Amino acid sequence: MRIKINLQCSHCGSKNYLTSKNKKNHPEKIQVPKYCPKERKVTLHIES
């Protein structure tokens, strides 16, 4: 079963991206480098 998750910037705390994941295959939190428009650079985004 896929669930919707928000990706939150680790620097400024803004929620910039909405994605989905299969909780059965990936029970751990997702960490992805993405562009943060508030910081104007690529930062680590963590599942919130």
Curated annotation (Swiss-Prot):
Protein name per its UniProtKB record: Large ribosomal subunit protein bL33
Molecular-function GO terms, alphabetical: structural constituent of ribosome
Pfam families: Ribosomal_L33
Cellular component, GO annotation: cytoplasm; ribonucleoprotein complex; ribosome
One example of a Gene Ontology biological process annotation: translation
Source superkingdom: Bacteria
Keywords: Ribonucleoprotein, Ribosomal protein
Family statement drawn from the similarity comment of this UniProt entry: Belongs to the bacterial ribosomal protein bL33 family.
